[in-house]
Design a protein with these regions (language model features):
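Local sequence-structure signature of Cys/Sec-based thiol-disulfide redox active-site neighborhoods
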Residues: 15-50
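Structural micro-motif
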Residues: 75-88
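Non-catalytic, surface beta->alpha helical segment in thiol-disulfide oxidoreductase systems
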Residues: 86-118
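Residues at alpha-helix caps and immediate loop-helix transition turns in enzyme cores, especially N-
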Residues: 39-41, 67, 98
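N-terminal leader/targeting and pre-domain segments
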Residues: 1-24, 114-118
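A short acidic, amphipathic alpha-helical/loop segment
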Residues: 43, 70-71
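Thiol-based oxidoreductase modules, predominantly thioredoxin-like and allied folds used
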Residues: 29-30, 53-70
């Protein structure tokens, strides 16, 4: 299954709660409509593709602001877009936004928080 086939799109606060409850180890990518979103996702896509066991949710912020706000509410991490959050044991362990979403930063966080995971 490809990464794009594995993506769960979250549109409501209830979907955020259900996703995080079902997947204590997961990634959430908040996508805006600017070029930063597509460029940052393209940079980290191979890393996420290689972690086939890591559930990935995407929130299209313009269309699903309440879902994005729910992530900020439950994590205490202010909303940004684009933004990548990694969760371990149901808690956020990594947060990067905008141009700080790099292959180097994300790769290191994946290796640190999910060693040996694919």
């Amino acid at each position: 299954m490809t990464l794009k086939e594995r993506i769960t799109f979250l549109t409501t606060p209830e979907e955020v709660d259900a996703f995080l409850s079902a997947h204590p180890r997961a990634a959430i990518f908040k996508a805006g409509t600017c070029h930063k979103t597509s460029e940052t996702f393209r940079e980290i896509e191979p890393l996420l593709e290689a972690r086939s066991g890591l559930p990935l949710a995407v929130i299209r912020v313009v269309e699903a602001r309440p879902a994005s706000n729910r992530v900020a509410e439950v994590t205490g991490i202010p909303h940004e877009s684009p933004q990548l959050l990694l969760f371990k044991e149901g808690r956020p362990v990594f947060d990067r936004d905008n141009w700080d979403i790099t292959a180097e930063a994300v790769g290191g966080a994946l290796d640190e928080n999910y060693p040996g995971s694919s």
